[in-house]
From Swiss-Prot:
Signal peptide segment: none
GO cellular component terms given for this protein: cytoplasm
Quaternary data: Monomer.
E.C. designation(s): 6.1.1.19
GO MF terms, alphabetically ordered: arginine-tRNA ligase activity; ATP binding
Locations listed in the record: Cytoplasm
Protein name (record): Arginine--tRNA ligase
InterPro entries: aa-tRNA-synth_I_CS, Arg-tRNA-ligase, Arg-tRNA-synth_N, Arg-tRNA-synth_N_sf, ArgRS_core, DALR_anticod-bd, Rossmann-like_a/b/a_fold, tRNAsynth_Ia_anticodon-bd
Amino acid sequence: MNIRDLLNQRVLAAMATCGVPADLPALIAPGKKAGFGDYQANGAMGAAKAMGTNPRDLAGKIVAALDLEGIADKLEIAGPGFINIYLKPAWLGKQIALAQTDARLAVPQAEHAQTVVIDYSGPNLAKEMHVGHLRSTIIGDSLARLLEFLGHQVIRQNHVGDWGTQFGMLIAELEEQLGAKGDAALELKDLEVFYQQAKKHFDDDAAFADKARDYVVRLQGGDAQMLKLWQQFKDISLHHSSEIYQQLNVTLTDADVRGESFYNDDLAPLVKALQDQGLAVESEGAQVVFLPELADKDGNPSPVIIQKQGGGFLYATTDLAALRYRVNTLNAKRIMYFIDARQSLHMQQVFTISRKAGFVSDAVSLEHLAFGTMMGSDGKPFKTRTGGTVKLAELLSEAVDRAASVVSEKNPELAGEDIAEIARKVGIGAVKYADLCKTRTNDYVFSWESMLSFEGNTAPYLQYAYTRVQSIFRKAGVAPETLGSPILLGSEQEKALAIKLLQFSEVLDQMAREAMPHLLCTYLYDIASLYMSFYEACPILKEGVDAEVRDSRLRLCHLVARTIAQGLGLLGIEVMERM
């Protein structure tokens, strides 16, 4: 059930009856304040302006033509022509009953399913994942989960950095450390240390540096020994990433990896295609595409090097090849890139070239979904105390440890294994939610204290709200699926909660459209807050509560729990029965 869509259809039909042109919107939105309707239709003002008529008069005609029999209690015109719509509690109760028994919580699947490619995470395999990878990984994953839930075919693409000149240095170092034999996994147990050793060796030893450069040429030429060492390095690095994904409860698998190396064979043909079209031209020995569309303030076109003077290719070349593959082979109709805001110009260049070259038609949506930076309490990018990058594995481990302290303090009687499992869900959930609940494009300050709080818009607060509902059912001794009584919405709290529950589909649609997970977080927090108000005002298991009223309230409770669990699940956050 999508109330907004239903009202939109009905109001548009009424507007058409009143002679309003079909391209003018009904502008349906939930009521913002008490006393201004459960929903508002705000299209009369714009329509009246376009038609040269009085907005209140037009609103009156729309109301007269509006068929909401059995759905709305009351329609009223406010201000210059707002139409306030008050929904019938009996109708809302029926919709709640349908949602409560529906496997999908009455969320319809998308009418026009698409193939959506989502490019996210993308760590460099030469280094361990750090906090800078967190945002792309969890924001991208939440959209992948959501779009699949809505019925789209989602193809995850983990565009890892597995190619480039640094691999000559790393392979040479690995070969020397392995000697005649040895365990590569053991040598690479700390990728960060290994990378630093290789870099120092490269900087300090000219002979080693020459060997590293030679190894790059051999690797790029397909030398079997170089490829074998490179593959070992790649496998072990990917295993590190895979462990992080499992810890984070992220859906990326090895099958989703499409490293830069995957596109190697297409780079030269791609450059030739751009040359043949006159888009790529020689400039100082390099092949460059000049884009007047992205000119600087002095009118100089934006230069994009796609092949260096020595014949080497660049990130832009690989990204263009990846884009061509995603459109031609994967048949993507929407391609979403969850990449740092600092790559904004680069992505604009890639998108512009791909359109001009005809690699991508106008029917394909290309979206760079940039995000802000995680900051420390000093207002600078989040670092260790010594100023180094924070490893993601260490951050997640600390989150679980801190959550274990909080959980054991609140519930000292819990068994050790229960504390460990709850702490894992609370700690990882807290880190993810603290990020996802912020507007994607904004920077935010990382704070252990606020993210692990059981108050406010946090994962622990929502997880706790879920467990409270579960405890009510244990106390009542009732299985939710046995409840079949009508839903009675006799109080303001019950009605407010019911309307919010029925807006789940609207919120998911908006999040899918705008790629903004904070919209879902805000919605879930609103649900939990309205539930707490309902719980305080509407007794459920107290003596003297009528059986039909009790069962109706239990059904509302059940839908609250399922909505929180489903919503958090789409964010990749787990719930627990007890806390």
